[in-house]
Amino acid sequence: MIIGGVPYYMDRFRPDRTMADNVNTIYFGKDRARQEFKDVYAGLYSTSDVYIKVIRQLVKYFYGMSRSQLLKALEKEGGGNFSEVLENLIDSGIIRSYTLYGGKRKQTIYQLMDFFSLFYLRFCENPEYTSWRSVQRSRPFYTWAGNTFELLVLEHMPQITDALRIKEYSTPFSWSGETPGGEGAQIDLVIPATAERADYICEIKFSEGKYVLKEEDADDITRHIEALRNSSVHKPTHSVYVALVTTFGMTESKHRSHINDLVTLDSLFS
């Protein structure tokens, strides 16, 4: 999740060195990552400054920003040039655009997807972090790990749907709304399975071991189901299933019945 499996960066990993040694060499050695970050964008775009400004803004908001939010934050006026910047970043795979459904409206959100940029901007520019070990010992590490695992899942939708035995599906989406009682609900990923006539709520959880489904998780799942069932994006004739997508599986607990399907890291790379 540090480099996203890009062959260029993978080739720089030495098999005779530990993970920590490799990360230290690539990211924390002699300003190498800083120069690499500049070179990546300079190599892709002739006017790289504006692209880097967009990336630096998006890294502040993991779930992304709308076009109007970006323009306001960057103090720019809308127009063809800015649209071209966003389109070029999407075409290169550095960002993605997705539809966020909420209430009765939907909006296009732009989200940073480049693993190298996410790690570099989060840790390498901060003097507090001088090595991979210092990163791993920090609280922001777990936030970053959870976020990038979610991106990893989004990049492997065919494998996710195969693991869930979904034959046909329409465009997956994120959703936010409320239960009939007014409780807020934010769902990371909904997969509308057309052939199965069902909506799959995917709860994406990073864990360094088997995930332990806690009572608050079970409460969240119940709220998510209730909110989605009462939303305009859900068809009343469709069922709602919950899939836990996590790294190494889950432990048995009294809340296990809240999960219909389990997808692990192995499924993403099988």
Language-model region placement:
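Domain-level recognition of nuclease-like catalytic cores that cleave nucleotide substrates
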Residues: 236-270
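Short conserved micro-motifs at the rims of enzyme active sites and ligand-binding pockets
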Residues: 122-124, 201-203, 213, 254-257
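Conserved nucleotide-binding/hydrolysis micro-motifs of P-loop NTPases
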Residues: 7, 102-103, 117, 206-208, ...
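Arginine/glycine-rich "motif VI" loop of SF2 helicases in the C-terminal RecA-like domain
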Residues: 223-238
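Non-catalytic terminal regions with compositionally biased, polar/charged low complexity
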Residues: 3-5
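Accessory nucleic acid-recognition modules appended to NTPase machines
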Residues: 8-9, 13-15, 19-187
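Mg2+/Mn2+-dependent nuclease catalytic core
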Residues: 207-227
